């Protein structure tokens, strides 16, 4: 979930060598040709990254993250004056870019159910406070709440121009919870914008990320108490089907192929290939059959990484969509 800069959306129509997965509904894909005046220049990534709390040793990581989110928000056409509801804001990496995009006349309500002390090396509370103290901080209102509870609470009559779920779908405890959230958003937001990993790799070096995500998802679904970043690794088709069931219609969809600066694939593959993953399986899984499946899944990740012969693991494709 960190930055591909100026890379354009690549679709199967534009690249016939990519195997097309089954699609729920074929729609127009966003391209540079139909961008609006709301486009944020990639050159602003450094400034936007400064709004977020960053380890002094790794400024490039935060810049890459900002670049990626600039790409997403440009695809969605979010701009000055928009009232945005962000579901699953986490530490606010997307929030910072949204706040820049909406300008002084717009606003961002950023909702996340995680406790304030969640996260490392910085907690949710620390990261959000840093953004609040930045040049765009007064455009953001943080809500530490379950999204559905928030929508049914004192904000029961509030409406937004757009609701955003940027790399937050996989954090949901289940597809049922996602469906309930999307139903609650219907009638409250004019548009729904979703970005999530696509479970496909246009770059061969991203294959280990796909395998690692599936392995992690299988492990985390063994525990109802999991708070890991991959609990519901839904495919684009599955997300679109859930959205359709909640009353949403696909407006546009396409793929972003991340550049090498987006390191999530590298991190996720490394996590699954590590011995700590083996210990997690031993601690959390009692069924021998499931242990065997997870051992094989980890083996596939290790083998895929070794096949790269030292090349760094890339991050898988990202599905970018909007609904009305």
Regions found by a protein language model. Give the residues of each.
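Conserved alpha-helix/loop element of class I SAM-dependent methyltransferases that forms part
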Residues: 63-82
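Conserved SAM-binding loop of SAM-dependent methyltransferases across substrates and taxa
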Residues: 91-104
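C-terminal lobe and adjacent flexible extensions of AdoMet/dcAdoMet transferase-like proteins
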Residues: 257-324
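Conserved class I S-adenosyl-L-methionine
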Residues: 191-217
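Short alpha-helix
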Residues: 230-247
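S-adenosyl-L-methionine
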Residues: 120-153
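A short, conserved alpha-helix within the catalytic core of class I
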Residues: 171-184
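A conserved beta-strand element that flanks and buttresses the S-adenosyl-L-methionine
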Residues: 164
């Amino acid at each position: 979930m960190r930055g591909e800069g100026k890379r354009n959306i690549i679709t199967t129509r534009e690249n016939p060598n990519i195997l097309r997965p089954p699609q729920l509904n074929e729609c127009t894909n966003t391209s540079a040709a139909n961008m609006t005046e709301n486009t944020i220049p990639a050159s602003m990534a450094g400034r936007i990254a400064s709004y977020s709390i960053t380890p002094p040793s790794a400024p490039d990581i935060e810049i890459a993250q900002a670049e990626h989110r600039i790409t997403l928000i440009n695809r969605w056409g979010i701009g000055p004056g928009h009232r945005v509801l962000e579901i699953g804001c986490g530490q606010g990496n997307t929030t910072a870019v949204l706040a820049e995009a909406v300008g002084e006349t717009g606003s961002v309500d950023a909702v996340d159910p995680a406790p304030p002390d969640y996260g490392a090396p910085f907690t949710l509370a620390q990261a959000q406070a840093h953004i609040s103290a930045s040049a765009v901080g007064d455009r953001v209102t943080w809500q530490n709440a379950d999204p559905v509870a928030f929508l049914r609470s004192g904000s029961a009559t509030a409406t937004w121009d757009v609701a955003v779920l940027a790399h937050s779908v996989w954090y949901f405890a289940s597809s049922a919870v996602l469906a309930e959230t999307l139903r609650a958003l219907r009638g409250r937001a004019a548009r729904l914008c979703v970005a999530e990993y696509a479970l496909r790799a246009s770059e061969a070096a991203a294959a280990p990320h796909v395998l690692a995500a599936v392995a992690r998802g299988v492990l985390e679904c063994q525990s109802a108490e999991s708070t890991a970043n991959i609990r519901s690794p839904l495919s684009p088709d599955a997300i679109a089907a859930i959205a359709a069931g909640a009353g949403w219609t696909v407006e546009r969809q396409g793929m972003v192929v991340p550049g090498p600066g987006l390191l999530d694939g590298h991190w996720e593959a490394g996590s699954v290939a590590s011995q700590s993953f083996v210990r997690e399986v031993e601690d959390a899984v009692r069924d021998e059959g499931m242990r065997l499946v997870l051992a094989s899944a980890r083996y596939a990740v290790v083998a895929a990484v070794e096949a790269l012969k030292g090349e760094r693991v890339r991050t898988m494709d990202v599905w970018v969509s909007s609904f009305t």
